[in-house]
């Protein structure tokens, strides 16, 4: 690859200078470890300003951990988690959700990465049957792994259905900042206010060096999460360096600047490539992901200059 820039993933980008500065600023003196420091408490309060004063906030190292441990907190081993077949928890987490929760994933094929109430109904036939797993969680990703967005009404409909059937709604928000920017809504509007119970809040895909947060909107669901996080090897001894990044990201509008720029660049890329001969977009670009079908013959030459992920 000749170019320093590529099109593979937001994970390939560097760290925002303001985030690096926040890490450096936190790198002074001795403070208590394991989250008992002023930086972690400050970051938790920043989250609560976005989501509500009784929000439970727990920092972890990565998105897979946020999803796997968040789902563990909400389930028993005889439960199941309903998700789209394209969901990150289903195809890109090496079975971590199943390992930690002990639950089965019930994946549903969708044309656009989005679940609907009608699709969810198709896997509820075994409820109450002791021979079958019992669905407890519906997990959606916003934006989805195909770059599509749930509307606010779609999220509310799934949440209402989940709660009517004694289930909870989990949202994988690895790119939640991009979703908020694209929807032009505050975080709480399409999460807590819409009926989401547990949220994985992503940071690394929006300018952080590393770090995600598991966010609980029902305090009872977080009752044992400190133990689950420790057992899951996600209790950072020097947690201030995760927390300080989130404070820098979320205290002002840095998160929004980053997300808007990423979304805008994705839109520009889609606009430029879609007019090329033999190229068409697989999904409408709604956030910061572009999935395009391009002629097989040109892929090797493109990869010599720019990294991207060839799909099927």
Model-derived features: positions:
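Active-site C-terminal subdomain of aminotransferase-like
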Residues: 137-139, 149, 186-277, 281-287
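Active-site pre-lysine segment of PLP-dependent enzymes
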Residues: 151-160, 164, 175-198
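Active-site phosphate-binding strand-loop segment of PLP-dependent enzymes
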Residues: 7, 115-173
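PLP-dependent aminotransferase-like
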Residues: 74-135
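Hydrophobic beta-strand scaffold residues
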Residues: 104-105, 169-171, 281, 308
